[in-house]
């Protein structure tokens, strides 16, 4: 799968290509995304009912998704971040399974890059 096909599954290629000038660089940063720990930190903090650390991890992940135009996952992470910003851990936890599925799909798409 090439980068354009990957973005057909995970986000907005036109937007990311306006920030990163070539597909090799986009691919490199997508590789770094797979090593980012913020999703795992978010999951652990939600499980531990740690609103402060969950917010921090969600906010970090939101920024990473925005910078790489990973809009499918990013939309869910924005909602989770805002619930946590308001201190609503239970609502954030309800939204998490959908985000977790999109994260899995994103990771699978990135793994299939040529």
Where are these regions (language model features)?
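Two-component system phosphorelay core
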Residues: 1-56, 60-114
């Amino acid at each position: 799968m090439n980068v354009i096909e990957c973005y057909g599954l995970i986000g907005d290629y036109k937007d990311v290509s306006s920030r990163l000038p070539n597909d090799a660089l986009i691919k490199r940063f997508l590789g770094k995304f797979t090593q980012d720990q913020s999703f795992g930190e978010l999951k652990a903090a939600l499980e531990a009912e740690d609103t402060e650390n969950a917010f921090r991890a969600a906010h970090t992940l939101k920024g990473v998704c925005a910078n790489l135009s990973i809009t499918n996952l990013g939309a869910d992470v924005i909602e989770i971040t805002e619930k946590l910003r308001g201190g609503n851990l239970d609502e954030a936890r309800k939204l998490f399974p959908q985000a977790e599925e999109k994260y899995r799909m994103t990771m699978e798409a990135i793994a299939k890059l040529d």
